[in-house]
Amino acid sequence: MNSKEGLKIGIDVGRMISLGYVEDLSDQELLHRPAKGANHINWQLGHLIQSENEMINIVAPGAMPKLPAGFAEKYTKDSATSDDASKFLKKAELLKVFEEQRAGTLKALDKQSDADFDKPTGVEYAPTVGAMFSMQGTHWVMHAGQWAVVRRQLGRKPMF
């Protein structure tokens, strides 16, 4: 296995875990907060999608599909406190945008050489191109830990 294949496995596992946790949740359930002051899943999905777009554009400028008009404005730090479903995309729309973005990520990953993964990014939390691609799986899993709590609060059985 080479670096590219290892990074793709991490990205794919992050996708499997994350989407597994939300596949049977309704739009209303995506607004449930795991704790007071925590962000609901709908907002977190938008944040993750937007972050992936930004991160991959840092290491592969222009590689990512454009986000839909108004997407960034719906998923800001200020909007995180809102529980008004009309201010956010529906789950089906979010997942469609996610799949478009993830396809861009995987296409950009495929174009990298092993030497490219060692190139610096200038970003503290992901100092190399390889680290930035790795973030695309780990960032999602980090948030999915909260989603496991939401699922239990909503009466769902553990998935993993």
Roles of regions detected by a PLM:
Residues 8-12, 16-19, 29-77, 122-160:
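Short, contiguous alpha-helical
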Residues 26, 110-113, 151:
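A structural signal for long alpha-helical coiled-coils and helix-turn connectors
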Residues 1-5:
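Basic/polar N-terminal segments that are highly enriched at the extreme N-terminus
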Residues 77-116, 131-136:
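Acidic/histidine-rich alpha-helical segments that form the ligand environment
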